[in-house]
Amino acid sequence: MTILAWCIAWVLDFIIGDPQHWPHPVRWIGRLITFVQRIVRRYCPGDKALRIGGGVMWVVVVGVTWGVAWGVLALAQRIHPWFGWSVEVWMIFTTLAGRSLARAAQEFERPLRENDLAESRIKLSWIVGRDTSQLQPAQINRAVVETVAENTVDGIIAPLFFLFLGGAPLAMAYKAVNTLDSMVGYKHEKYRAIGMVSARMDDVANYLPARLSWLLLGIAAGLCRLSDWRALRIGWRDRYNHSSPNCAWSEACVAGALGIQLGGPNNYFGERVDKPWIGDAQRGISVDDISRTIRLMWVASTLALALFIAARCGLSGVA
C-alpha cells in the first residue's frame, strides 16, 4: 500500500500538479515562517542574536511541520485505514512539484518564440532572484533551463529521497527545509544572519539528492537520445562551478546533455555576481532547450521513483 501511495501521488503530480487555488501545505509553512521570523527579529537584535534566532526558527518550523504531518496522518489512520492512506497520498502529492515546474517553464516558450521580451522578462522575474530587466532571449532561455535543472532536485528527487527514508512526514519536513531556504536563505544584508542556518541546512538536506541527480539525469540523457556520456562527464567536471555545493550537479549534467553553456555573470539585488560558466558552448542555447530540459526532468523523476521503489522492496525483502 505504501508503494502504491507513492505511485499514485507521482501520477497525480504528473497529470494535474498543484491546482492554483487549492490549499497547499507549503503556503501554510510559509505563513509559519513569516510568523516566527517576525518574533525572532523582534527579540534578537544584532547579527549574533539573529543567527541564533534563525537556528531556533529552523528547528521550530521543521519540527512543527514534521509533527503536524505525523499527527494528521496518525489521526487519519485511526479514523479509517483507507482514509489514512488517502491522506498519505495527498501529503506525498503536495511535496512533488514536477508539473508546476514544467508549467512554469512552458510559460516562456510562446513569448520567446514571438520575441516578446517584455513578457518574458516579467515572467522570469517571478521565478528567479536575478535582475531580468535587460536580459536578452539567450539569457532568458538559460535562466529557465537552469531553474528547471536545479529544481529537478528540490522539487522531485529530494522529496522522493526523504519519502523513502522516513515516509510522508519526513518528506513534508524536507519541504519546510526547502521553503525556509527559499524565504530567508539569502546572502544579502537583510537575511544573511537570520537565514544562515536555513541556507546551510538546505545544503545538507540536498547533498545526497543533488549527487544522485547527476547519475539520474545522465541516464535520462541517454533515454532521451541526448549524450549521456557527455552529460556525466560535464556534470562531474563542472560539479563545483557554483556558489552552492549542490546546484551545479544537476545544472552541469543538463548542460552536458544539451551541449550548451549555463551559469555566467548575473545581477542580483543590484549587485553583479560573476559566476563561473557551466558546460561547453557547442552551440547556442535556444527556446527548444526548455522542452528538452523538461523531458530530462520527467525521465529522471521516473527513474528516481523506480529506484526508491526497488530499494524499498529490497529492504522489505531483507526484513
From Swiss-Prot:
Name the keywords, alphabetized. Answer: Cell membrane, Cobalamin biosynthesis, Membrane, Transmembrane, Transmembrane helix
The UniProt entry lists membrane topology as:
Multi-pass membrane protein
Task: Show the GO MF annotations.
Answer: ABC-type vitamin B12 transporter activity; threonine-phosphate decarboxylase activity
Recorded GO CC terms: plasma membrane
The superkingdom of the source organism is: Bacteria
Q: Where in the cell is it found?
A: Cell membrane
**What function does this protein fulfil?**
Converts cobyric acid to cobinamide by the addition of aminopropanol on the F carboxylic group. However, the true cosubstrate could be (R)-1-amino-2-propanol O-2-phosphate, leading to cobinamide phosphate.
The protein depicted here goes by the name Cobalamin biosynthesis protein CbiB
Biological source species:
Salmonella paratyphi A (strain ATCC 9150 / SARB42)
